[in-house]
């Protein structure tokens, strides 16, 4: 059975993390990015967790543009995090350190499950198919640690550039691909992982271009300077838009496949053309 993905929950591709212990930057983050992730996991220490929860509860932000990242299910503060979210207008909840089960405390919320444990990778199908899960997001660094590794990316002594992060290792790329495929099969959206070196704008751009053209709904950002880079990556090039317009126009005159500039165009390419135009329209 075909099910449409709930992509309308992601209003734009540039999704910026904001630490929950810094309420002064909440409005700035929402003004810059398409969506903001108010972060209780890495954005607040244990000593200030109550204050951070209150910061989120008191924030007057557009609920359609807010994701709250709670602590993982094994954290002592998980239940209090979820209870706080239920007291707010916010319903999109990002849950880190998922293993195989979605905790019952999340019932009725829109859950973005993080795939960053070996157990979650093995159990992606069940996680993606859970009725409360609307999307998946992955994290390379925690997964690398839990796999017993030391680096999620190739290093200069392995042939990577000296002046920028290398590409992800095969285990990371496999996780990303499996997550994306299982999410699509279950009718859910995906968000691509952060590019940790926010000075590496070219690397961020290249990874975001791949995410956009592969079908991810958005890419996570950890610094405001990454936002426009992501938007630019998700915005189709003029030549792509021109091609898509021609394909869609020509498809009106043919019941099936047709030839355009020496290339055979059939239903999958027509669908891709429509998506290019949708991306271009969404990019404004």
Task: Report the location of each language-model feature.
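Expand to "…catalyze enediolate/carbanion chemistry for C-C bond making/breaking, isomerization
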Residues: 1-284
């Amino acid at each position: 059975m075909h099910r449409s993905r709930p992509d309308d929950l992601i209003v734009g591709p540039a999704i910026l993390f904001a630490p929950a212990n810094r309420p002064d930057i909440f409005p700035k983050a929402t003004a810059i990015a398409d969506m903001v992730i108010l972060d209780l996991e890495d954005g607040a220490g244990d000593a200030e967790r109550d204050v951070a929860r209150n910061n989120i509860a008191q924030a007057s932000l557009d609920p359609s543009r807010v994701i709250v990242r709670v602590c993982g299910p094994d954290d002592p503060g998980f239940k209090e995090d979820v209870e706080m979210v239920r007291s707010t207008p916010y319903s999109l909840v990002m849950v880190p350190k998922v293993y195989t089960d979605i905790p019952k405390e999340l019932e009725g919320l829109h859950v973005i499950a993080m795939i960053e444990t070996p157990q979650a990778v093995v159990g992606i199908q069940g996680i993606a198919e859970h009725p409360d899960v609307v999307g998946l997001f992955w994290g390379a660094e925690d997964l690398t640690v839990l796999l017993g590794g030391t680096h999620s990316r190739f290093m200069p002594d392995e042939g990577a550039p000296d002046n920028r992060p290398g590409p992800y290792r095969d285990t990371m790329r496999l996780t990303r691909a499996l997550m994306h495929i299982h999410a699509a099969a279950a009718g859910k959206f995906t968000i691509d992982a952060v590019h940790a070196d926010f000075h590496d704008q070219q690397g961020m751009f290249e990874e975001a271009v791949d995410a956009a053209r592969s079908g991810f709904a958005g890419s996570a950002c950890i610094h405001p300077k990454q936002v426009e880079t992501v938007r630019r990556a998700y915005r189709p090039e003029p030549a792509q838009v021109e091609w898509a317009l021609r394909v869609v126009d020509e498809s009106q005159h043919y019941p099936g496949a047709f030839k355009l500039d020496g290339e055979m165009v059939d239903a999958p390419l027509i669908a891709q053309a429509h998506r290019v135009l949708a991306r271009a329209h969404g990019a404004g």
